[in-house]
C-alpha cells in the first residue's frame, strides 16, 4: 500500500495539480500582469514551503551528519547561493511562461510546449560529456514535429505568445540543470523554499519596473484564489509530493512518466474549465509531444548501459 501511495498516487496527484494550475494562470493573465502574478504566487509558495519543511523532514529517513558551527555557516551560505541561482533561473522561466499566456497562449498549448524541457535536459547533457540514449534523439525528432504542429502556422510563422512559451521551455531546462548541480548537497525542500523567495524578489523588481503604473490592488485581490492555488498547491504541496515520491519510489521511471502527464491534465483542464479548443493539427502536436516526453524518460536498454559503463 505504501508503495502504491508513493509510486503512483503522489506523482499522479502532482501531475494533476501542475496541469490544473495552467487554468489558474490563464484566468489570472486576463486581470494582472505576468510579473505581478509570479511575485505574489512565488511568495505564497515560499511561505507554504517554509511551513512544509518540518513536515517533510518527518518522512526523510536519511541520517543527518552533525556539523560544526563553521560548517553550518558554510552550509547555510551555500544553500542561499544555490537558492539564488535556482531562483534566478526559475524567475526567467515562469515569467516567460506567464508572459506567453498574457500574450494569448492557451493553457493546453502552454502545458505541452513547456514539457519540451524533458527532451532538452538530456540533450544539454552533451555539453557535460554525458551520453545521450538513442530514445532521446528519437524523442527530439518527434518533439520537433510536435512543436511544428502546435506552433507553426500555414504561412510558416510562429505566434509571439507561442515563441515566449518555447523560450520558457529552454529556461526551465536551465533551471533543472542548475537544480541538478545544487540539489545533491542540500535539503530539497529547503533549497526550493529559498528558490521561491528569490524568484518572488526578481518578479517583484520586474513588477515595479514594468508594471508599476498598471498595478491594481482590486485586480490583485480578484485573482487571489488563483494566486494561492498556484503558490500553495502547485508550488508548495505538489513539489513536496514530488520529492517524497522520488525519494521513496523504487521505480523512478514510472514516477517521471506519471509526472509528465502534467501536459495531458493541462489540456483536459483547459477544455473543461476554459472551454478551450484546438485544431486537429494542434491535437496531433500534443500527441507527438507526449510520445516524445515518454521516449525521453525511458531507460536505455541494459546492453547499452553496460557498454557505456
Kindly label every feature range from the protein language model.
Residues 1-40, 88, 92, 96, ...:
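Glycine-/small-residue-enriched transmembrane alpha-helix faces in small-molecule transporters
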Residues 3-8, 31-39, 75-79, 152-171, ...:
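Juxtamembrane helix-entry segments on the extracytoplasmic side of multipass membrane proteins
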Residues 7, 31-92, 118-124, 171-178, ...:
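Transmembrane alpha-helices of multi-pass small-molecule transport proteins
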Residues 16-47, 105-109, 174-199, 213, ...:
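Juxtamembrane helix-loop-helix junctions in multi-pass membrane proteins
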Residues 21, 56-113, 147-149, 231-249:
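Specific transmembrane alpha-helical segments of multi-pass solute transporters/efflux pumps
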Residues 40, 110-116, 179-200, 235-272:
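Helix-helix packing/entry segments at the starts of transmembrane helices
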Residues 42, 51-53, 57-58, 223, ...:
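C-terminal-most transmembrane helix of multi-pass membrane proteins
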Residues 49, 132-152, 172, 203, ...:
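Hydrophobic transmembrane alpha-helices of multi-pass small-molecule transport proteins
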Amino acid at each position: 500500500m505504501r508503495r502504491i501511495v508513493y509510486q503512483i498516487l503522489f506523482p499522479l496527484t502532482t501531475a494533476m495539480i501542475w496541469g490544473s494550475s495552467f487554468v489558474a494562470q490563464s484566468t489570472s493573465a486576463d486581470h494582472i500582469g505576468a510579473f505581478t502574478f509570479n511575485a505574489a504566487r512565488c511568495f505564497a509558495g515560499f511561505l507554504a514551503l517554509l511551513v512544509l519543511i518540518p513536515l517533510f523532514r518527518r518522512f526523510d529517513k536519511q541520517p543527518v551528519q552533525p556539523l560544526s558551527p563553521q560548517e553550518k555557516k558554510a552550509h547555510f551560505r551555500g544553500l542561499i547561493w544555490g537558492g539564488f541561482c535556482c531562483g534566478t533561473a526559475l524567475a526567467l522561466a515562469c515569467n516567460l511562461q506567464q508572459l506567453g499566456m498574457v500574450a494569448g497562449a492557451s493553457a493546453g498549448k502552454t502545458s505541452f510546449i513547456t514539457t519540451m524541457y524533458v527532451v532538452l535536459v538530456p540533450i544539454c547533457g552533451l555539453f557535460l560529456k554525458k551520453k545521450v540514449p538513442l530514445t532521446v534523439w528519437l524523442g527530439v525528432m518527434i518533439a520537433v514535429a510536435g512543436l511544428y504542429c502546435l506552433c507553426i502556422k500555414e504561412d510558416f510563422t510562429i505566434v509571439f505568445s507561442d515563441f515566449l512559451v518555447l523560450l520558457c521551455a529552454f529556461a526551465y531546462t536551465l533551471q533543472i540543470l542548475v537544480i541538478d548541480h545544487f540539489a545533491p548537497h542540500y535539503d530539497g525542500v529547503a533549497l526550493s523554499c529559498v528558490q521561491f523567495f528569490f524568484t518572488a524578489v526578481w518578479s517583484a523588481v520586474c513588477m515595479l519596473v514594468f508594471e508599476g503604473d498598471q498595478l491594481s490592488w482590486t485586480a490583485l485581490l480578484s485573482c487571489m484564489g488563483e494566486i494561492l492555488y498556484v503558490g500553495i498547491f502547485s508550488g508548495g504541496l505538489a513539489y513536496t509530493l514530488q520529492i517524497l515520491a522520488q525519494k521513496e519510489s523504487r521505480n523512478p521511471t514510472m514516477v517521471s512518466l506519471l509526472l509528465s502527464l502534467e501536459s495531458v491534465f493541462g489540456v483536459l483542464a483547459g477544455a473543461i474549465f476554459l472551454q478551450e479548443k484546438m485544431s486537429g493539427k494542434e491535437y496531433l502536436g500534443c500527441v507527438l509531444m507526449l510520445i516524445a516526453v515518454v521516449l525521453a524518460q525511458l531507460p536505455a536498454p541494459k546492453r547499452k548501459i553496460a557498454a557505456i559503463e
